[in-house]
């Protein structure tokens, strides 16, 4: 028997990164990790910078980095509207490492304004999310 699937669209302002049937989706919502399978209750939630892990039909996995956005779950359609989205294999590890170091340095020197600190914290979260995806791809 075939696994139950749902249609998923992952889009950003720049492009559509994925459109097709998936068995499951995992994202980082505003309240923590969230998994969506076929038959999930309708939902609308904010997404934090992180990984979209999707399991396509027949078990193939794909990883996409998003820098925040919105998740909408309808009975037969799941949509990820990302602020920015990049396929996992297109991420630049050296750039992510450099961004992580810069954000940590900015936070360590006690940013002069709270806004600077918050911006550095967001940059750090984005860099860590990118590095997590790169590590996941290495495990495959």
From Swiss-Prot:
Subunit structure: F-type ATPases have 2 components, CF(1) - the catalytic core - and CF(0) - the membrane proton channel. CF(1) has five subunits: alpha(3), beta(3), gamma(1), delta(1), epsilon(1). CF(0) has three main subunits: a, b and c.
Keyword Cell inner membrane tagged: yes
Protein name: ATP synthase epsilon chain
Pfam family, one: ATP-synt_DE_N
Superkingdom of this protein's organism: Bacteria
Gene3D superfamilies linked to this entry: ATP synthase delta/epsilon subunit, C-terminal domain, F0F1 ATP synthase delta/epsilon subunit, N-terminal
Membrane-topology descriptor: Peripheral membrane protein
An example Gene Ontology molecular-function term: ATP binding
Physiological role: Produces ATP from ADP in the presence of a proton gradient across the membrane.
UniProt similarity note: Belongs to the ATPase epsilon chain family.
InterPro entries the record matches: ATP_F1_dsu/esu_C_sf, ATP_synth_F1_dsu/esu, ATP_synth_F1_dsu/esu_N, ATP_synth_F1_esu_C, ATPsynth_dsu/esu_N
Residue ranges that the Swiss-Prot or TrEMBL entry lists as coiled coil: none
Localization in the cell: Cell inner membrane
HAMAP family reported for this sequence: ATP_synth_epsil_bac (MF_00530)
Alphabetized UniProt keyword annotations: ATP synthesis, Cell inner membrane, Cell membrane, CF(1), Hydrogen ion transport, Ion transport, Membrane, Transport
One GO cellular component term noted in the UniProt record for this chain: proton-transporting ATP synthase complex
């Amino acid at each position: 028997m075939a696994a139950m699937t749902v249609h998923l669209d992952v889009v950003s302002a720049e492009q559509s990164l994925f459109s097709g049937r998936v068995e499951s989706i995992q994202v980082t919502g505003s309240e923590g990790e969230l998994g969506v399978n076929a038959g999930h209750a309708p939902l609308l939630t904010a997404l934090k910078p992180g990984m979209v892990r999707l399991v396509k039909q027949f078990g193939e996995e794909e990883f996409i980095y998003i820098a925040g956005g919105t998740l909408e779950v309808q009975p037969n359609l799941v949509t990820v509207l990302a602020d920015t989205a990049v396929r996992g294999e297109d991420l630049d590890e050296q750039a992510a490492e450099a961004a992580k170091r810069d954000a940590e340095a900015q936070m360590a020197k006690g940013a002069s304004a709270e806004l600077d600190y918050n911006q550095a914290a967001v940059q750090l979260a984005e860099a860590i999310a990118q590095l997590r995806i790169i590590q996941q791809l290495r495990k495959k």
